Amino acid sequence: MAAKHVVFGAEARERMLRGVDTLANAVKVTLGPKGRNVVIEKSFGAPRSTKDGVTVAKEIELEDKFENMGAQMLREVASKANDTAGDGTTTATVLAQAIVREGMKRVAAGMNPMDLKRGISKAVAEVVSDLAHHSKKVKTNEEIAQVGTISANGETEIGQMIAEAMAKVGNEGVITVEEAKALETELDVVEGMQFDRGYISPYFITNPDKMIVELEDVLILLHESKLSSLQPLLPILESVVQSQKPLLIIAEDVDGEALATLVVNKLRGGLKIAAVKAPGFGDRRKAMLQDLAVLTGGQVISEDLGIKLENVGMEMLGKAKRVSIDKDNTTIVDGGGKKKEIEARVSQIRKQIDDTSSDYDREKLQERLAKLAGGVAVIKVGGATEVEVKERKDRVDDALNATRAAVEEGIVPGGGVALLRSSKNIDVVGLNDDEKAGIDIVRKALEAPIRQIAENAGVEGSVVVNTILNNKSRSYGFNAQTEEYGDLVAMGVIDPVKVVRSALQNAASIASLLITTEAGIAEAPKKESAGGGGMPGGMGGMGGMDF
């Protein structure tokens, strides 16, 4: 085992604090509408320019092992805030730095770190309940757009686009962000249920110009296994021909005699038909077929359930108003499923999301939920250069996460004002002087975000704080974008409660760990052995050779 280097007490805390300051100072320049960019060198390609706190934090590694420990613990604050609320990473970093610096001063003055930690926890709990008490629910499209605009650093176009996407696919719908190949940023909405399987044979195409299959008022056969033989299919095909409606077959695969017969009948015009492979694999395929059955009001034909294909009646087929299939995707619009059954299926998937511990499973379940509940919207972010597109995509991601958080837990006035107001409402009492000092640490730290926003805008932070506190209205604050004071909610400067809350809770959690640190252990640097690099001995007899 390699030797370790151990430092204690004040030295351990000081070196960690240096790391905390290095990371926080790099991250906090990005805070607020007048925040600056940070340029990050990449091992290949152009440097990356960003205003996203967590992206900056993830790039920082320091040479000194103990400074690096402090920086990595602070990086955890930004990552945690990003995971919980998807935004507020810079605010969390600024708060953590403020709590750590104040806390370290008190510990150096001889106060008990554990009592300070208890005081910090009490104050944070009080602030969280104060934020929840004063939050306002987001209802209108305008409010959703305002939240998105603020988080995208004042880009109205992005805020509007997110509001439009949420209006179209609902709060449960999936909204994804991709890089576009064009200059413009655009919104693409897919209604209904879409899955990533295209037509099995191009002979099914009904619209040769667009190379797609379009079917109206469709019957849908959902089969779990592979269809190769024609015989079991004949009874249901005859019934479908008599009904004069198109048929879509979704099965594990369709090949051989079955596929040949379907294609021939389609080309002769006797049968409007198309076949696609079922989405997913293994157990997930079964679950997705069941989703399709609920959505279309049909039944999955499965040998496990004892249902044979030759015994299938028309009542077991699903229905949909419209189906569109291209070579990669199938979209089913307006399925004939009962609303009650769809809602039951949605709540079942929601419960599975709550119960699962795997991020991958959660993501897949959320996709299924969105396909059942709303639809899918894609925001394609454009720009003149690759660097610009990446920077804008970061901001759109932040804005999208902030908007979702706002819909979930409501909003408070932005610009750091909510935390500043809450700092004056902390009325918990510490059990002793050290706990009281812990509460005071949080009171002072809650001023840090608004001071930083003001300073990034080139205004004196102390003046801004005093001006705001002299006004009694909770929503009165400083708009750094326009450098005006006024009602921030009316100006559209708002923050989601979830973002502010998780920023504070994560900052306090990691800051408390740093304050209560009494020793640090790191791997000792390896000493270079003297005399290295020489030729090994024992080759003396080769001196006369001429190379």
From Swiss-Prot:
Descriptive protein name: Chaperonin GroEL
PROSITE patterns: CHAPERONINS_CPN60
GO biological process: protein refolding
Region (Disordered): 526-547
Enzyme Commission number(s): 5.6.1.7
Gene3D superfamilies membership: GroEL, GroEL-like equatorial domain, TCP-1-like chaperonin intermediate domain
Keywords on record: ATP-binding, Chaperone, Cytoplasm, Isomerase, Nucleotide-binding
Matches recorded under Pfam families: Cpn60_TCP1 (PF00118)
Top-level taxon of the source organism: Bacteria
Protein task: Together with its co-chaperonin GroES, plays an essential role in assisting protein folding. The GroEL-GroES system forms a nano-cage that allows encapsulation of the non-native substrate proteins and provides a physical environment optimized to promote and accelerate protein folding.
Amino acids binding ATP: T30, L31, G32, P33, K51, D87, G88, T89, T90, T91, G415, D495
Presence of keyword Nucleotide-binding: yes
Species per Swiss-Prot/TrEMBL record: Hyphomonas neptunium (strain ATCC 15444)
Chief localisation class: cytoplasm
Family designation: Belongs to the chaperonin (HSP60) family.
Subcellular location: Cytoplasm
MF term (GO), any: isomerase activity
Subunit field text: Forms a cylinder of 14 subunits composed of two heptameric rings stacked back-to-back. Interacts with the co-chaperonin GroES.
Catalytic activity: ATP + H2O + a folded polypeptide = ADP + phosphate + an unfolded polypeptide
InterPro entries xref list: Chaperonin_Cpn60_CS (IPR018370), Cpn60/GroEL (IPR001844), Cpn60/GroEL/TCP-1 (IPR002423), GroEL-like_apical_dom_sf (IPR027409), GROEL-like_equatorial_sf (IPR027413), TCP-1-like_intermed_sf (IPR027410)
Cellular component GO terms, alphabetical: cytoplasm
Residue ranges with Gly residues bias: 530-547
